[in-house]
Amino acid sequence: MYKRQAEKIAYGLCKQGAVVISGAAAGVDSASHRGALRAGGKTIAVLGNGLDIVYPAENEWLYRDIAASGALISEYPPGTAAEAWHFPVRNRIISGLSLATIVVEAPEKSGALITANTALEQGRDVFAVPGPIDAPLSRGCNRLIADGAAGLITDSWDVLREYEAIYPHKILGERVELPRTLGYQAREEQA
């Protein structure tokens, strides 16, 4: 559910010209990058390891596709393996490069909440997708919304409307939905 929501939101934003910035980790991060790529949009992956290391290993195809139509960036030198503490540290770069941070999935203690709190400290906007009140993976999102720290969104248009005054040309297009069958497939998936 969460990965599909992330992919749909990224797809809709990229169809209107936004750039998706995420961390290329398994789960929601990868889904966000996939949505951007499927929309034919730009995406930037901020890595918690050196550029020469693929983490997680199953994302090799995703790294290649992001590099072809976006960017892979890292503050870590080549040869630096992914370490658990790298990810919360790199999240400041993700939020710092972004106009807004969108939280789709967040347990009470998570990297997504670290990114959201960093974004707030940096004066950036934060949005969150609400979830079932008894779902552990929605507790962080629901708390951000309840505390007034994040705007409630249900799709990409909720985000785009917030920036209509700044980017009116981005809002003029028709509302787009993630199609059931998508034109984009990772090279590895095509084989």
Language-model regions: role of each:
Residues 3-191:
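Glycine-biased, small-residue-rich flexible motifs in mid-sequence functional cores and linkers
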